[in-house]
Amino acid sequence: MAKNQKQTYISPKKFMQTKARTLPIGKCYVNDGWEENGFAIVVVTRIRPSGNLVYGQFLVDTYCLGVKDAFFVENMDAFDFEDAIDKLDSSYQMVEFPYVEAHNLIYGAIAFAEEAGIKPCQDYAFARYVLEEDTDGIPLIEYEYGHKGKYFL
Protein backbone atom coordinates (compact mmCIF):
# COMPACT_ATOMS: atom_id res chain seq x y z
CA MET A 1 0.00 0.00 0.00
CA ALA A 2 1.34 3.44 -0.88
CA LYS A 3 2.58 5.82 1.79
CA ASN A 4 -0.06 7.92 3.54
CA GLN A 5 -2.90 5.77 2.22
CA LYS A 6 -5.21 4.25 4.76
CA GLN A 7 -6.83 0.93 4.16
CA THR A 8 -10.56 1.48 4.07
CA TYR A 9 -12.82 -0.79 6.05
CA ILE A 10 -15.54 -2.61 4.18
CA SER A 11 -18.28 -4.37 6.13
CA PRO A 12 -18.81 -8.11 5.56
CA LYS A 13 -22.18 -7.47 3.91
CA LYS A 14 -20.75 -4.80 1.61
CA PHE A 15 -17.85 -7.11 0.75
CA MET A 16 -20.31 -9.84 -0.23
CA GLN A 17 -22.31 -7.45 -2.40
CA THR A 18 -19.36 -5.85 -4.18
CA LYS A 19 -16.40 -8.23 -4.14
CA ALA A 20 -17.36 -11.87 -3.52
CA ARG A 21 -18.47 -12.67 -7.07
CA THR A 22 -15.16 -11.42 -8.47
CA LEU A 23 -13.25 -14.20 -6.69
CA PRO A 24 -12.67 -17.66 -8.19
CA ILE A 25 -14.91 -20.52 -7.07
CA GLY A 26 -13.26 -22.95 -4.66
CA LYS A 27 -14.44 -26.29 -3.35
CA CYS A 28 -18.12 -27.12 -2.97
CA TYR A 29 -19.76 -29.84 -0.89
CA VAL A 30 -23.17 -31.42 -0.34
CA ASN A 31 -24.42 -34.02 2.12
CA ASP A 32 -24.46 -37.53 0.66
CA GLY A 33 -27.99 -38.85 0.11
CA TRP A 34 -29.67 -35.47 -0.20
CA GLU A 35 -31.80 -36.77 -3.08
CA GLU A 36 -33.53 -39.32 -0.84
CA ASN A 37 -34.27 -37.22 2.23
CA GLY A 38 -35.40 -33.92 0.73
CA PHE A 39 -32.80 -31.66 2.27
CA ALA A 40 -29.33 -30.69 1.22
CA ILE A 41 -26.58 -28.88 3.06
CA VAL A 42 -24.65 -27.13 0.31
CA VAL A 43 -21.29 -25.45 0.91
CA VAL A 44 -19.81 -23.13 -1.72
CA THR A 45 -16.46 -21.37 -1.36
CA ARG A 46 -14.54 -18.67 -3.17
CA ILE A 47 -10.81 -18.14 -2.88
CA ARG A 48 -9.48 -14.80 -1.66
CA PRO A 49 -6.07 -13.52 -2.85
CA SER A 50 -4.70 -14.29 0.65
CA GLY A 51 -5.68 -17.95 0.29
CA ASN A 52 -8.47 -17.55 2.82
CA LEU A 53 -11.99 -18.38 1.72
CA VAL A 54 -15.38 -16.82 1.37
CA TYR A 55 -17.70 -19.51 2.74
CA GLY A 56 -21.39 -19.89 2.04
CA GLN A 57 -23.62 -22.56 3.54
CA PHE A 58 -27.19 -23.22 2.43
CA LEU A 59 -29.82 -25.52 3.94
CA VAL A 60 -31.96 -26.46 0.96
CA ASP A 61 -35.39 -28.10 1.29
CA THR A 62 -36.00 -29.77 -2.07
CA TYR A 63 -39.52 -30.86 -1.10
CA CYS A 64 -41.07 -27.42 -0.62
CA LEU A 65 -39.37 -24.54 1.17
CA GLY A 66 -36.29 -23.88 -0.98
CA VAL A 67 -33.48 -22.20 0.98
CA LYS A 68 -34.51 -22.56 4.63
CA ASP A 69 -31.28 -21.24 6.11
CA ALA A 70 -28.11 -19.64 4.81
CA PHE A 71 -25.05 -17.92 6.16
CA PHE A 72 -21.67 -16.72 5.01
CA VAL A 73 -18.22 -16.02 6.38
CA GLU A 74 -16.41 -13.49 4.24
CA ASN A 75 -12.88 -14.36 5.43
CA MET A 76 -12.34 -17.93 6.67
CA ASP A 77 -8.88 -19.43 7.07
CA ALA A 78 -8.04 -22.99 6.02
CA PHE A 79 -8.08 -24.34 9.58
CA ASP A 80 -11.60 -23.03 10.26
CA PHE A 81 -12.78 -24.29 6.88
CA GLU A 82 -11.48 -27.82 7.51
CA ASP A 83 -13.04 -27.72 10.98
CA ALA A 84 -16.42 -26.66 9.55
CA ILE A 85 -16.37 -29.41 6.91
CA ASP A 86 -15.26 -32.02 9.48
CA LYS A 87 -18.14 -31.06 11.80
CA LEU A 88 -20.66 -31.26 8.96
CA ASP A 89 -19.12 -34.52 7.74
CA SER A 90 -19.42 -36.16 11.16
CA SER A 91 -23.22 -35.77 11.00
CA TYR A 92 -24.06 -35.58 7.31
CA GLN A 93 -21.32 -37.34 5.29
CA MET A 94 -20.29 -34.44 3.09
CA VAL A 95 -18.99 -35.12 -0.42
CA GLU A 96 -17.35 -32.79 -2.93
CA PHE A 97 -19.88 -31.45 -5.41
CA PRO A 98 -19.21 -29.59 -8.68
CA TYR A 99 -20.11 -25.91 -8.51
CA VAL A 100 -22.50 -26.12 -11.48
CA GLU A 101 -24.51 -28.78 -9.62
CA ALA A 102 -24.55 -26.76 -6.39
CA HIS A 103 -25.67 -23.70 -8.34
CA ASN A 104 -28.52 -25.53 -10.07
CA LEU A 105 -29.65 -27.30 -6.90
CA ILE A 106 -29.92 -24.03 -4.95
CA TYR A 107 -31.48 -21.88 -7.65
CA GLY A 108 -33.84 -24.69 -8.73
CA ALA A 109 -35.10 -25.16 -5.17
CA ILE A 110 -35.67 -21.40 -4.87
CA ALA A 111 -37.65 -21.34 -8.13
CA PHE A 112 -39.74 -24.34 -7.04
CA ALA A 113 -40.53 -22.74 -3.66
CA GLU A 114 -41.32 -19.37 -5.25
CA GLU A 115 -43.97 -21.06 -7.43
CA ALA A 116 -45.77 -21.76 -4.13
CA GLY A 117 -45.19 -18.19 -2.89
CA ILE A 118 -42.33 -19.14 -0.57
CA LYS A 119 -39.27 -16.89 -0.48
CA PRO A 120 -35.74 -17.85 0.63
CA CYS A 121 -34.78 -17.14 4.25
CA GLN A 122 -33.67 -13.58 5.09
CA ASP A 123 -29.99 -14.47 5.41
CA TYR A 124 -29.96 -15.65 1.79
CA ALA A 125 -29.98 -11.96 0.79
CA PHE A 126 -26.23 -11.73 1.48
CA ALA A 127 -25.12 -15.38 1.38
CA ARG A 128 -26.30 -15.56 -2.25
CA TYR A 129 -23.32 -13.47 -3.35
CA VAL A 130 -21.04 -16.49 -2.90
CA LEU A 131 -22.99 -17.93 -5.87
CA GLU A 132 -22.71 -16.75 -9.44
CA GLU A 133 -25.76 -14.95 -10.77
CA ASP A 134 -28.26 -17.36 -12.29
CA THR A 135 -27.66 -16.69 -15.98
CA ASP A 136 -27.43 -18.69 -19.19
CA GLY A 137 -23.66 -18.78 -18.63
CA ILE A 138 -24.15 -21.60 -16.12
CA PRO A 139 -25.20 -24.88 -17.78
CA LEU A 140 -28.70 -25.90 -16.73
CA ILE A 141 -29.15 -29.12 -14.77
CA GLU A 142 -32.72 -30.13 -13.98
CA TYR A 143 -33.41 -31.68 -10.60
CA GLU A 144 -36.70 -33.03 -9.33
CA TYR A 145 -38.27 -31.01 -6.57
CA GLY A 146 -41.19 -31.87 -4.32
CA HIS A 147 -42.07 -35.30 -2.97
CA LYS A 148 -43.69 -37.55 -5.55
CA GLY A 149 -44.18 -34.49 -7.73
CA LYS A 150 -45.97 -32.37 -5.09
CA TYR A 151 -45.08 -29.78 -2.49
CA PHE A 152 -44.46 -31.59 0.76
CA LEU A 153 -44.15 -29.84 4.12
Feature names for model-found ranges:
Residues 2-153:
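Non-catalytic terminal/accessory regions
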